[in-house]
Amino acid sequence: MSGAGAPTFTPDPAAASGLNVAIVAAQWHTEIMDGLIAGAQAAAADLGLEPVLVRVPGTVELTVAAARLAERFDVVVVLGVVVRGDTPHFDYVCQSVTQGVTEVSVRTGVPVGFGVLTVDTEQQARDRAGLPGSREDKGREALEAAVLTELALRRAGA
């Protein structure tokens, strides 16, 4: 979700009660990742949820971790940062992670919140990481979006 025109919503803690949530976070860009993780964990705490945090080396590893965790969790959230460099590596990583996470969600039926920042500069990532002075909190948004999706599917009987 983009900051401009983003919907305003908050999941209902009573409806979210008992959801098993996993947060998978890459380790690159420590300060930014700390902000994303804190935002996702705060959103979970606001809902009375205690997510399991799994750390993986990099953003590419988020996909396999999400696939395995989707076997036993109701909601999975992936968090990472990919900053554009001078080589096509950025494009390969962003495409593979986006496709992989989407495939995990569609194949398993488990909502996977996408909190992977794909940015041109580290400052753009900091602006979205929920750090002091940030304009956005993509960690919180990713967790809330995944929880809201799971709740909508349950209401629909899916």
From Swiss-Prot:
SUPFAM superfamilies: Lumazine synthase. InterPro entries: LS (IPR034964), LS/RS (IPR002180), LS/RS_sf (IPR036467). The active site is at 89 (proton donor). Its EC number is 2.5.1.78. GO terms for biological process: riboflavin biosynthetic process. GO terms for molecular function: 6,7-dimethyl-8-ribityllumazine synthase activity. Belongs to the DMRL synthase family. This is 6,7-dimethyl-8-ribityllumazine synthase. It comes from Micrococcus luteus (strain ATCC 4698 / DSM 20030 / JCM 1464 / CCM 169 / CCUG 5858 / IAM 1056 / NBRC 3333 / NCIMB 9278 / NCTC 2665 / VKM Ac-2230). The gene is ribH.
